[in-house]
Every structure is written in structure tokens, then in C-alpha cells.
Amino acid sequence: RILDAAYEAAKGSAKIGTTGKGIGPTYTDKVSRNGMRVGDVLSADFRQIYARAKARHESILRGLGYEYDIAELERKWFEAVEYLKRFNIIDSEYFVNECLAQDKSILAEGAQGTLLDVDFGSYPFVTSSNTVCAGACVGLGIAPNRIGEVYGIFKAYCTRVGSGPFPTELFDETGARMRSIGHEYGAVTGRERRCGWLDLVALKYSIMINGVTQLIMMKSDVMNDFETVKVATEYEVGGERTAHFPYEIGDDLKPVYREFEGWKCDLRDCKSYDDFPAAFKAYVEFIERLSLIHISEPTRQA
């Protein structure tokens, strides 16, 4: 965490809005082949492994000129290590593949959106790992051909925490309403999420990268009382329109919107698709038509 704070401070106004939990520095250690692994806590040389990592990190902090006090964090960290030792630490890749061999169902849930992926997201405003579907393969140790259905879960509007490009962001009362009604605050930091209209360019890009087979839309009830609802279908850059997600999103990029009539009812009262108002169905079917993917839903008995 201290390294995370030091790196952010060194970037000044160019900071990326990290959660400050030390995720980036942890991945830096991993990629440089200096990182500690969970299995190390069981090693007889654990203290020496830790001491080497600590010395390396302190050298970086001195180079950045960052003042810090590690005592309290270090105490909590060693408490966490002792807690971790209580668990049965296994080679999980064998466990998962044995379950697959027994025809057991495994649900892998991603914690972050496609545009936070370190390779395919809005770099450098990304996390340090692969948040796309392929990340499940390297995260679990399974082959790509073992993946079955890929469910693309998205909100009926867009949100983002921290810095980074957001073409459909709303800076007005509408965006504030989305945030308030949708309780849009960061799960880790509690920061206000930036809110905006649904971006179909970004959604279609995410569908392509992940190989999505079914879409699941959530939080459409946040806009129950909206008079109109908009969807970005294309971007306009330099006077030309494109439906491709660009390598870099600059200030000259403008979203092109399609406006829909609001459904003006409480969707929570609907028990099946037939119960939905025509305005909401038009919104859903438009997204399906442009994304070429069906929006599915659980039954009320699921």
C-alpha cells in the first residue's frame, strides 16, 4: 500500500486513481519475478524471503523520496499471514481440472470490467491484470477450450471509478440521479462513481474481446422515472463516425446518441418479459439488435 501511494504521488496530476490497496506493486513484483507467493508462507525460509522483498521495496521508496511508517501495516500483515496458514493451501489448478473431469459446473466471476483490463482496457487507466474472460484461464489454470457459456454482465447505464476516459459521462443532474438512485459508490474506496449513458461501442467491443454468448443487463430500474434514456451508438472523431473502440480516447471524441422514451414505471413489479412496458422492450431489443447478442434473465424462481 505504501508503494502504491508513493507511485501515485510521484505521478502528480497524471495519477490513475488507484484504490491504494497495493495491487499494482504486487503485480510489478510478479512480472519482475521477485514476488512472494502464497505457498511461501509455509516455507522454512519465509522470514528471509520477506526480508529480501522488504529491502527491495524500501530501496524504491528511498529513490522516490517518500516518507512512510511501516510498523502498523507490517503488524497487520503478519497477523494476516498467520490467519492464512489455517487454510489448506493446495495446487488449485489440479483441483479445478479434477472437478471439470467429473463434469462439475464451475462459475468463474470477474471482479472488474473489460475496460480495466491491462491489455485491452483504456490504458493506462486500468488495473494490473487481465479482467477479460481469458483471465479465467490463467487465473484458474484451465485450458481455453474448457470455457462454456460466457455471460456478459452490464449495467443499463455506464459507470467508472477514478480517472480515465469516459465518453458518455454525464456532469449534470441526470448523472447525479443515476449515482444517487443506483448507490454508485466504489466498493473498495467508497468514492463516487462517475455515471453516464450506456455506451454500445464499448459494449460491443467487450462482447468481441470476451466471446460473450449471453448478455445480462442489470440496474435498469435505476432509470424508472427518467423521461428519456439515451444510448451511444457510435463515436465521432475528427468529423468522421466510427463504431470501433479506438486505441486512444481523446478530447475530440464525441458520442453519437440514439434517444428512447423512458418506461416510467417500476420494473420490479414485472414478473416476466411480457409484463415489461413497450418503451423498455424497445430499449432492450435495440441493444440486442446492435450487439447481436440476446439479453437473458433469471426466472423469478431462480
Please tell me what each predicted stretch does:
Residues R1-L290:
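TRNA-recognition modules of translation machinery and tRNA-sensing kinases, especially anticodon-binding
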Residues I293-H294, Q301-A302:
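Single conserved hydrophobic/aromatic residue that forms the stacking wall/gate
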Residues R194, P298-T299:
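A subset of signal/propeptide-processing and intrinsically disordered low-complexity segments
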